[in-house]
Every structure is written in C-alpha cells, then in structure tokens.
Amino acid sequence: MNDDVVRGSAIIADGKGRFGIDTIEVDPPAAGEVRVAITAAGVCHTDHASLSWPGPRVMGHEGAGYVEAVGEGVEGLQIGQPVVLNWAIPCGHCFQCERGAAPLCERTHELDVAHLGTSRAHAGATRWRGRPIERAFHLGTFARYTLVRAEAVTPLPPNLLLDVACILGCAVMTGVGSAINVAAVAPGDTVAVLGCGGVGLNVIQGARIAGARTIIAIDRVPARLERARELGATHALAPDEADRDHIRLVAQVHALTAGRGADHAFEATGVPALAFLPLKLARNGGNALQVSGAHGPASMELTELFWNKRYLAPLYGGCVPSRDFPRLFEWIAQGRLELAALISHRYPMEALDRAFDDMLQGRGTKGVLRIA
C-alpha cells in the first residue's frame, strides 16, 4: 500500500459549461478502496452533458489504467495490474439488487468514495485547491489518479491495450448489454439501430453476437455506416434530410423486415427529438429502446404505443459488472467482439474541446483521451 498523497492533472468542470486542466490531490486508499493511475479514458455524450451539472467536479466516467495503491482488505488486485473501471457498483442487498436489478441499486451513491456528503470525499479524500471535489459517476476518469471502491475495478486480461479497453466500462457495456440483456435479441431476430456512434456500434455487435438475422444500421455519416457494416450490420440506411417526418426511413426499415418493422429498434443518437422514433421502426409487439441517455424534452403520439409495443430506456445495458465483464473478455478473446475498430480518434487531455466538437458533429465514431 502507498501511504502517500498523490498529485496529478485532472479536467475539472465548473458547473457553468466550462472546463479546464488543473491539479488535484488524492489520498491513499482506506480499507476496501483502490487508487488507480489512469492512462486512457473514453469520451461520450454524457461527459458533454456533465458540463451543466453542479460543479466543480472531476470529469469522465470511462477509463482504464494501473492499480497504484490498494487499501486494507482488498483481494485479487496487485499494484501495477492493468484494470478497467465501471461506475455501476451494486450493494447486492437493497430492494432492486435482491430482485435482480443490480444496475438500479438504491445504494450506489453510498458505496462510492467521491459523492460529497455520504463518503470520505466529504472530508477531503480528493481535493482541488484545498477543498473536496466530487468526481463524475464516482470515478472522474479524466484525471491522472482516481480513488474508488474495489468493486469498481476489474482486472484486464493479458494483451488488451489500455487505450482500447478504456471504453469497455460504459460504451461497450451499455450497447452490447442493451441488445443481449435488455432486448434479449434472439437468433433470427431483426434489429434496427438509429445512430452508429460508440453505443450504437456496440448494440450492433451485441445483436450480431446474439445471432440476429437482419441488422439495419441508420446514420447520416457514411464513414459510420461503413464501420457498422464491418461490425455486423447487414444493411445500412442514410436518412434523407428532406424526410423530416421519417416516412421514407420507416418505409425502408419495414421493407427490410417483411413489412412488419424490426423486432427490436434502438435509438443511440443522443438527439432528444429522435428518442421515440424507434416506436415507428419496431413491429407490433416489438421492442423500442432509447439507449443513448439523451437529455432534454421530447414528445410523441400516444398511438405509437398501441399494438403491444414496448418502450424501454435501460440503464447501463442491464449489466452487472461481475457477470458481464467476463463475458465481454471471452467474446474479445474469441474475436467476436471488436474494440480497436470502434475508436476513430485519440486526443491529449488538452484537446477535450476538440474531442467534444468531433463527437457532436459526427466526425468519427468514438474518441479516447490520453491521460498524463
């Protein structure tokens, strides 16, 4: 165990839409905690949305790095071991956990070490300019060091590069899990995926792994559609901007699914106005899922819910890290789950503004920050 306080760079949001790089201090881990030296972190729409959350806070919720220090009682983790982080830490005992809904754990905030008011961070375990600071999703992966519960840390298999593995904890888990755990895509099913960024491409991978017969990728960016094809999409549709009511797009999806609509239709664009479009793409009795975590108001005609259509907005792909990380690792080893092909851009910490702009403008598929 390293008993020293460490200092390192972090990207800090001020709660008013601005962010900057500064130095934070991180205490050594207490019992049941691990301090991780982050080397790479994924960038997603939720990180951009967090700019408006109450601040200040250390940004970032996808990341990978090395175990730098372990607290008393931590087993199975060694200093120097490569690890990936996750923010969904179930307690295992609350109402939701006992009914098998661990991603909805009612005590998640109590189990972290970064939530001010309920944990050691309130007393200053992580500090910025001499004052306690919160970390996004209990992690704050846009920082050289983070202090987390041991349950948030999963050892990585050999030969899995950190700047690739860093996206496993959210984008991959959410996308693949939404297809397999929540929608329960089955062999022979038809799937439509609206939006082919980091989450959408992993929905496509999950559907392919599950044995879907038809996987329809929908995006306005040709490069994203090409990548979707490479990762398992059987068809690629580029919506026409003139088709504002999506009449033509809906007709195209129905034409590819025997006139019925898809068994499962996913929204992964992050655009609130498109949140309910999957209901038009799904067949009667089918599933429509909003998996992008889109923020903002949206409206729909209630008739879209007729004919036994189900609308779901799953959290974290219904994943339980202790169960689902081993499955992801197995699929990676088998060559069934691609990671490197998902990442289109890598940026230094100083270029987060450019990473956000590329993401919001649809340039590329998934961005990763190099943390130093």
Predicted features by range, described:
Residues 37, 93-194:
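NAD(P)H dinucleotide-binding glycine-rich loop of Rossmann-like/cofactor-binding domains
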Residues 190-196, 208-275:
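Adenosine-nucleotide cofactor-binding segment
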Residues 1-6, 276-280, 322-372:
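C-terminal hydrophobic helical "lid"/dimerization subdomain
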Residues 25-41, 51-98, 103, 111, ...:
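Glycine-rich beta-strand-centered segment in the early N-terminal region that forms part
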Residues 200-201:
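N-terminal Rossmann-fold NAD(P) dinucleotide-binding loop
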Residues 212, 271-336, 371-372:
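Glycine-rich phosphate-binding loop and adjacent beta-alpha segment
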